[in-house]
């Protein structure tokens, strides 16, 4: 089936105007991208260095949300927003949608609904760095956002593979500050370089996604400060994550435990809840907001000058 050319459009890619063409092409003319951030990690860990299109489809179908998207596209009778492709037909944005249409086409090869797909084709001279930044604008900042870990993976690739600066990424995504980009990089590196080795074969993208908020809070929390640079603390926290011994909301309470030697020792041996129990035993006010407020008030009164206390007594009378 011959492709049909439509209109041209100017698309802003990494701050530059790029003239793209809108076309309708046979579904078989497109190739999935093995560098797709949603499947990149699983593909690397599989050891498959030359995946076939069927291999890539399998990885994509295993992603959460795939079945729901396939149902939506099937009921709609196709897709309306064009997928973005390179000049040679390799998919830049829309790998999951291409997989859905390809799968439906295999099931109903005679149906005209699944024979073609709308595309927006980039010219040959667009550099890969600009394409990677375009994906960040779509999926890190745009309405069709990837899961948090996939977004972090894309940010990490922009810095380490394409040599983009945190400032450039912040400008392109618009919803992240330079500091937030740096924190994202720190959290990603911690998960990849310290948590994954501790977890071994148990890690996959679902695991890493479930621990993302923990890692981000760990690198953001100001109270952790210099404690965060202690190798033993980093190792202990990685162990807590791999053994599911700390919840996301509990990371914020970690500094209090690390300031107590006994609680820290229990933390490393038995997990967060056991360590927090040590603190509660030493200080019962931890479990009661009223008692904590009374404790603070008592401390403030103890620091007041005698004349101020006498004035208070006189006023009460």
What does each model-found stretch correspond to?
Residues 2-113:
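Short, charged/polar connector segments at secondary-structure boundaries
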Residues 41-44, 72-75, 124-128, 137-140, ...:
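Short hydrophobic/aromatic-rich motifs at helix boundaries and adjacent loops
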Residues 110-117, 152, 177-257:
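Amphipathic alpha-helical "recognition" segments
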Residues 258-317:
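Charged/polar low-complexity intrinsically disordered segments, enriched in acidic residues
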């Amino acid at each position: 089936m011959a492709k049909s050319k439509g209109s041209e459009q100017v698309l802003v890619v990494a701050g530059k105007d790029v003239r793209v063409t809108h076309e309708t092409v046979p579904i078989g003319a497109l190739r999935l991208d093995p560098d797709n951030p949603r499947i990149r990690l699983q593909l690397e860990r599989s050891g498959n260095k030359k995946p076939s299109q069927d291999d890539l489809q399998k990885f994509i179908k295993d992603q959460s949300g795939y079945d729901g998207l396939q149902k939506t596209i099937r009921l709609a009778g196709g897709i309306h927003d064009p997928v973005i492709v390179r000049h040679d037909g390799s998919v830049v944005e829309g790998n999951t949608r291409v997989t859905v249409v390809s799968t439906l086409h295999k099931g109903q090869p005679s149906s005209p609904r699944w024979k073609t797909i709308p595309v927006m084709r980039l010219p040959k001279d667009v550099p890969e760095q600009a394409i990677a930044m375009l994906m960040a604008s779509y999926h890190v900042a745009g309405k069709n956002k990837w899961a948090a870990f996939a977004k972090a993976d894309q940010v990490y690739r922009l810095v380490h593979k394409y040599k983009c600066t945190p400032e450039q990424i912040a400008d392109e995504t618009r919803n992240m500050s330079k500091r937030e980009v740096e924190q994202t990089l720190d959290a990603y590196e911690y998960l990849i370089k310290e948590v994954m080795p501790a977890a071994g074969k148990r890690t996959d993208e679902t695991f890493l996604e479930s621990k993302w908020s923990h890692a981000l809070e760990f690198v953001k929390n100001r109270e952790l400060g210099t404690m965060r640079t202690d190798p033993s603390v980093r190792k202990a926290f990685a162990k807590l994550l791999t053994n599911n011994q700390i919840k996301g909301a509990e990371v914020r309470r970690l500094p209090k435990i690390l300031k107590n030697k006994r609680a820290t020792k229990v933390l490393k041996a038995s997990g967060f809840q056991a360590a927090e129990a040590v603190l509660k035993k030493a200080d019962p006010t931890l479990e009661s907001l009223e008692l904590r407020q009374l404790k603070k008030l008592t401390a403030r009164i103890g620091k007041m000058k005698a004349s101020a206390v006498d004035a208070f007594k006189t006023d009460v009378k």
